[in-house]
Structures are given as structure tokens and as C-alpha cells.
């Protein structure tokens, strides 16, 4: 059986799955042909078990349909083709969220050939393989006293003898306790906690990606703060990628590149934000490539963030993209309504402000793009409340966020939703308003109605009237139907998510 057949079937499966599922579970798989048998390699036990349970049956069907029609011989193994260095499922306890949703991982370091034992497809025993670790993290096995609080951000200088001095800022308020968890960030939070609590057995590198203001930086700081809580002597360095570039340029100017290398390669944990700024900076990428390799070979933790999936960063060398996939890559999605409400309630509680639940719900319904804008809106409301000497009510919120709400209403109108949905499904707006019931029109119409209910303040009768004079029960049925399909139909779920993102950003 050929590898080409496998690739053909994987492409067919790509069309059936949401992009995030495909990138998380199928993309990391490697394959090689051994006679009539296909050997499929998963990077670790979790990916293997998940693929076995969720996708193996469909893959075998596709292989049979597109091959000889006979069920193929296929083995699932842990490792990588051509015997890459051994990788392991961690010894430490793994949260259910991580176990259920491990992201784009590939085999770790290249090393002398090591045999990869086949794993029975239905097996579930833990697989333990050697991993290297850094002795300085051994001290984290027992909790230590937390470092003294220093306001919002702690100025913490980490110095290596004979090397550059670099001051790293960890925001002491960005902790796991202050992070509001929801469906959109559950996996990212679980993975970050695993790294923070078990630095010798976590995922390296941990790569978090997603839009602006979704909590990636918060989680990165939370990991750093937790590492320092467990071991105040740990050398934890947080910086923006532009700081790395600036340090390198300065080192070159001072003829101190060796000191620069010594500093960055001696830390216990390196946390770099917005890695996409390395794009098209060839010398910076070259230096970071070697720094990254040195850190992982020493068992030192690396955490990176970006505004997009690493493979999609243009101007970034392929070898870096490949290495970023060695560990765990996790998407952070925009928060859903319930999470937005929880964030507002928590922020109000931290500010010792009474925020009625209906007021939080009102703000959360209208500010949808990211957490940063949500917090900014709440700060405006609180300030307005203090200045006016009034309690926070929906009326006060309307006054304090008047310009912002007007902009949101302008951006997200039923007309705009209809136009966006029609363009997405390549139909006419008149089709959405017509009486046609063919699936190619009826389903987009239901999607548009559901989006109108979620994104606007119109009542069901008003929405129905704007969709060709339909009854409010038709709109209610459409909303319920789309909510059901989002749970069972991958295509509808992906369509809805794409349209929601387009309409709210």
C-alpha cells in the first residue's frame, strides 16, 4: 500500500473535519509503507488513543474505498518514521482537557536510531520513554514560598555571570487564579498548567496561538509566576520577540554575541510573546534557531505565542516552523457568551464593584471580539459610575458605552449578516428572503437567523420580519436547529465559527 494513497485519503478527511480538529489530530501523523502494511506514527500516546477512537474507522473506510476495496493492514505506533529520538507520554498526571485535545505535535529531537515498538490499536497502557530534563527544575518538586509581590508587574533581573543582564517583567496579577476558564480556552489553560506544575514532564515547546486579547499572554505570565512560586531561584525570562531582536543587535554592536548566547541559553524557562515578529528577520531567526535547539536539548522550557498557527506565519523559516511543532500547539479562541459574562463578573469582583448579572450579560452580548475590549468597556462603565455617583445599571451602561455600542450596532446588523452569509455560501440575499426550501438555501437562511439572534438585539418577530416576513416560530426553530447541528455536524460548526469571526472582528 502506497504512502500516496494515504495522503489522498488524508486530504479527503481534511474536507470532512473542521480545520482545528484536522490540525490537532491528523496533521501530526507520519506514515511509511512496509510491504503491504502502512505504519502510521503518532507523536505520543494521547494522540494515538484519540486517533484510534475517533478517526481510525473513517480512515480505514477511505483507504478501502480508494484502494483495492479490501480493508488495509495498518499499524498505529508511537514515534516517527525512520526512528526519530524517543518521545514519551509524560509520567505526571494529565488533565482530561489536555488528554482529550493534544495539539499539533511531531517527533522531538533527531538522535541515534531507536526501535519503535508497535502499539496495539486498542491498547491503553502508558508508554514510558526516556526524556532529558534540567537539574535546576528538580527543586520544583516541592512547593516553595511565593516571591514577594511587587505591584502589577515585577521587575526581576536575571543575571548570568559574564553574560548580558536582562530585566524580565512578569505581571504578578496574571496567574491561573485570575484566569477565567471557558470552552474557548480550556485546553490552553490545561496545557499551560501542565507545563507550570510539571516542568520536567510537560510539553516543550508550548505554542499558544490566537487573535489579539484572548489570554495568551496571561497564560504565559501565569506559567512564569507559578514556576517562580515553586522555585524562587529559577531563571524565568519573559520578553516580547522584538526584545530578543534588540538584544541580539546590541550584542552584535558591542561584539558580545557570545555573552548574548550564554545568557539566553542558560535560563530555566524562556517565554517569548508574538513570535510572528521574527518573520523576515533572517539573522534573528538563525540565532533563535540555535537558542531553541540548545534549550530543548538541555530540557529547559520554552513557551511561545503567536497570532496565527505556526505553519501559517509567512517569512518564517520552515525549520523553525517544524521545531515549533515538536511540543504542543494550542489554539485560544474568542470567548463564548458565558465566559465573557464570567470574565466581567470576576473583573468587577477584583475591582470591588457590584455588577448586576443582567448588566454583565448586556455588556457581554455586545462586546464579543476579545477579552481586552471587554475589560476596557467594563473600566469605562466603572469610571462613569464613580464619577456620576450612580449604581451600574443597563441605562448607565448605555450612556457610558454610547459610541462603542453605536459602532457595534452599525457593524453587526441583520442586513450585514444577510450579506455576509450570502457571500459565504455564494447565494443571493434575495434567496435568503425567498420562500425557497431547497437545502442549499434553507440551511444558510437558518444560519443567518441564528447569527441574527446571537449578534443583534432584535426580537424573534423582528428577525422573522426581516427574513421575508416569516413567523417568530420559524426563527426559533432555525436557532434550535443550528445549535443542534453545531454539536453534530462539523461543516455547520466550522461555517458558523467562520461567519461569527468575520462579523465580530
Swiss-Prot record:
User: Which SUPFAM superfamilies does the record match to this protein?
Assistant: P-loop containing nucleoside triphosphate hydrolases, TrpR-like
InterPro entries from the UniProt entry: AAA+_ATPase, Chromosome_initiator_DnaA, Chromosome_initiator_DnaA-like, Chromosome_initiator_DnaA_CS, DnaA_C, DnaA_dom, DnaA_N_dom, DnaA_N_sf
Compartments, record wording? Cytoplasm
Keywords assigned by UniProt, alphabetized:
ATP-binding, Cytoplasm, DNA replication, DNA-binding, Lipid-binding, Nucleotide-binding
- List the residue ranges of the region (Domain I, interacts with DnaA modulators): 1-90
Residues binding ATP: 213, 215-217
Q: Where does the record place the region Domain IV, binds dsDNA?
A: 386-505
Positions of the UniProt region annotated as Domain III, AAA+ region: 169-385
What NCBIfam families is this protein classified in?
DnaA
Q: Domain comment text? A: Domain I is involved in oligomerization and binding regulators, domain II is flexibile and of varying length in different bacteria, domain III forms the AAA+ region, while domain IV binds dsDNA.
Q: Check the record and name the HAMAP family matching this protein.
A: DnaA_bact
What name appears for this protein in its UniProt entry?
A: Chromosomal replication initiator protein DnaA
